[in-house]
């Protein structure tokens, strides 16, 4: 799984996952579940988790 780290503002880390929807119009945020109240943003067929301050990881699962 390929990961890219983007720094947005001073406190929000966004991890881009290459999780792909199944091609049937399924929302990728239904496949990739973000943790700790992180927001999931569907960008095409890719899910992006916007981690709250203090969390990191593809799905914001790691306290930082």
Curated annotation (Swiss-Prot):
UniProt-listed InterPro entries: EGF-like_dom
Query: Which residues are reported to carry the modification Pyrrolidone carboxylic acid?
Result: 22
Keywords recorded for this protein, A-Z = Disulfide bond, EGF-like domain, Growth factor, Pyrrolidone carboxylic acid, Secreted, Signal
Q: Which residues does UniProt assign to the signal peptide? A: 1-21
Origin: domain of life: Eukaryota
What PROSITE patterns does the database record attribute to this sequence? Answer: EGF_1, EGF_2, EGF_3
Query: What cellular component GO annotations does this protein have?
Result: extracellular region
Q: Which cysteines are joined by disulfide bonds?
A: 29-40, 34-49, 51-60
Q: What is a single Pfam family found in this protein's UniProt entry?
A: EGF
Protein name, entry field: Epidermal growth factor
The species this protein belongs to is Lymnaea stagnalis (Great pond snail)
């Amino acid at each position: 799984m390929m990961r890219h780290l983007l720094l947005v503002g001073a406190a929000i880390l966004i991890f881009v996952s290459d999780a792909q929807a199944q091609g049937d119009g399924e929302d990728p945020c239904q496949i990739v579940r973000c943790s700790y109240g992180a927001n999931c943003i569907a960008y095409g067929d890719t899910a992006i988790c916007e981690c709250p301050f203090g969390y990191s990881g593809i799905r914001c699962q790691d306290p930082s």
